[in-house]
Amino acid sequence: MNDFLITKVLNNNVIICTKAQAEYVLIAKGIGFNKKSGMILQENQTIEKIYILDQKSQQDHYKTLMELANDTLIQAVIEAVNIITNSEMKVDNQKLVISLTDHIIFAYKRLKQNQLINNPFIVETKQLYSKEYKIAEKVIERLNHVLEVHFPEDEIGFIALHIASNTESLSMREMDLINELINKSVFILENDLKQTIDKDTIQYQRFIRHIQFLIKRLRNGESLKKTNAFEALLKEQYPLCFNIALKIMRLLQQELKIKVYEAEVIYLTLHVYHFMENHKS
């Protein structure tokens, strides 16, 4: 670290340095305190964790974000990132520090202006990404403490999705699409079965996980082994369940623009059947 030359101190937590004629943005709690341009960053300086941005596009975006936030907010964001990177989750530190800084700065500004955004996927996020959700709870707890605010539970879900999108190599847009397709599938279920699905049940957790992994299989071009005899049996004995499963499959095929293999209908029919039977009992 001792060969980093400080060229600019953005704030107490962010500095711009050069090393071997290349520019870097260094981010860490208190890294800029009492620092000035022209100083060398000492290797033995006690710093909890440093995040280094070496790509110009990332640096430019991060510098722009720094103009929108004060030291306290940036420190809170860094502490939030530290909570995630110190957890068992394997994340891309550079990608995470950029996306989370962007999200938290604007979430904080919306909160101060009382412009809250409802999270329609809070239940699904909590079910699908339980580990990420628990970490997000700690993040929000820390943000609330440092910033002296109270983020709503919806924000826990948003943070959890940021963590999950980083660990699963999916963009936020792709994760939103998966949640949207799950919601549309549940709507088809409730509408055709004429019942309200209890989202706190194990059956619901299994269903949304099935849809989640089904979408992943489709995107990866994977298919399940087809059993014609079993398919014919389900179609004959449980026509309503089979048709609901078929309708959901057509939805996925249309939205994802990917071929859905017939074998998938069999396994989805079984899930629909369990919902129908549990409702009867």
Curated annotation (Swiss-Prot):
Give a GO molecular function annotation for the protein.
RNA binding
Origin organism of this chain? Staphylococcus saprophyticus subsp. saprophyticus (strain ATCC 15305 / DSM 20229 / NCIMB 8711 / NCTC 7292 / S-41)
Q: Of which family is this protein a member? A: Belongs to the transcriptional antiterminator BglG family. GlcT subfamily.
The alphabetized UniProt keywords are: Repeat
Signal sequence, renumbered to the chain: none
Record carries keyword Repeat: yes
Lineage per the UniProt record: Bacteria, Bacillati, Bacillota, Bacilli, Bacillales
Pfam families given in the database record: CAT_RBD, PRD
What is the protein name given in its UniProt record?
Protein GlcT
User: NCBIfam families under this entry?
Assistant: antiterm_GlcT (NF047357)
Outline the extent of the PRD domain: 65-173, 174-281
A biological process term (GO) from this entry: positive regulation of DNA-templated transcription
